[in-house]
Regions:
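N-terminal accessory regions of S-adenosyl-L-methionine
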Residues: 1-104, 113, 217-241, 252-257, ...
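Glycine-rich helix-loop-beta junction characteristic of Rossmann-like nucleotide cofactor-binding loops
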Residues: 106-113, 165-166
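A conserved beta-strand element that flanks and buttresses the S-adenosyl-L-methionine
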Residues: 176
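C-terminal alpha-helical "lid/dimerization" subdomain adjacent to the S-adenosyl-L-methionine
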Residues: 208-277, 282-292
């Protein structure tokens, strides 16, 4: 069962979203079906039935506590190695360790400033290892030491709290914060950003974001997923981001104890937060539903630099 009050509240919220966000759920399922068929073409005939069965089990949960158990059972039954989900688990682990880090690095490389880089929320370290191989001095941190063998040579410090950035002031030219902030609980978002600003002159932040329809859409204009997403009411866009995140982490990967902070924001909300703490927005790029991602969401990359007058603020 969910062990903390925060986790119980998060699962109740996700349960409500699943039960009442029918439009968002339909969008999420069609997004996943299209993506899984594209990434796992050998098994495309299994995909729709698997998603429908998974969804039926999740919707049968009567409350957040039951949804927590259902997510674990659905993962084991349909997505884990050794069972009916071997097709998914083998393909996904290859993607996560090989293709995904290369794509992620390509999406960030042009924005990295200087030579020292912090990968904040580094996980297994696949991306950090590539950053190191590209000639940067790459440092890592996360709430737990999840590093795989390719990243064990990189400096790592474990975070002592959800807002801790355990490195010295001004230590980095750039910090990469990839789809981390929406997993942070609301009271921690600004303290964490202030700590990141303390250690790095530039932050390269990628977030699952909604309310992007008034942004200039260059390369993304022909993404059918983004067109469909932008037609949804903003409240439904938010629900879809919640469901995509829950499905991609708890259901597909079995990460049922992940902190689902659900801090999804509009582009203009992120801009106001950055401005309020002395971070100047250098670039905002709507990447949208990147075709290379298995679990796609509407992603926006923000490049923000510290206003030098605010170092000690």
């Amino acid at each position: 069962v969910p062990t903390t009050a925060t986790q119980r509240a998060q699962y109740e919220f996700i349960h409500e979203t699943l039960q009442h966000g029918t439009t968002a759920l339909n969008f999420t399922l069609s997004l996943l079906e299209k993506s899984y068929k594209f990434h796992f073409p050998k098994y495309s005939s299994n995909v729709r039935a698997t998603l429908q069965d998974a969804c039926k089990h999740l919707l049968a949960a009567d409350n957040g506590r039951e949804l927590y158990q259902a997510a674990a059972e659905v993962h084991e039954r349909f997505f884990a190695a050794g069972g009916d989900g071997s097709w998914f688990s083998e393909g996904y682990s290859a993607y996560k360790s090989r293709r995904k880090p290369v794509q992620d690095f390509e999406n960030f490389a042009d924005a990295i400033s200087g030579s020292s880089v912090l990968d904040f929320g580094s996980g297994r370290g696949h991306l950090a290892a590539l950053i190191g191989r590209a000639g940067f001095d790459c440092y890592t941190t996360d709430v737990m030491d999840y590093r795989g063998p390719e990243a064990t040579h990189l400096p790592f410090r474990q975070m002592a709290s959800p807002v801790d950035v355990p490195y010295a002031d001004d230590m980095f030219d750039s910090a990469i914060v990839k789809t981390v902030l929406h997993h942070v609980d609301e009271p921690h978002v600004i303290p964490l950003l202030k700590n990141l600003r303390r250690v790095a002159r530039r932050l390269i932040i990628e977030e699952d974001t909604y309310g992007v329809s008034d942004m200039p859409l260059k390369v993304t204009a022909n993404q059918s997923e983004l067109t469909q997403f932008s037609k949804l009411e903003e409240s439904v866009q938010f629900q879809a981001l919640v469901l995509i995140d829950f499905f991609g982490n708890a259901v597909a990967q079995g990460l049922i104890d992940m902190n689902f902070g659900c801090q999804f924001k509009r582009v203009n909300e992120w801009h106001s937060i950055f401005n309020s703490i002395g971070l100047r927005v250098v670039d905002t790029h709507v990447a949208g539903f990147r075709s290379g991602n298995v679990h796609k969401a509407c992603q926006v990359r923000f490049v923000v630099d510290r206003e030098e007058s605010s170092v000690k603020a």
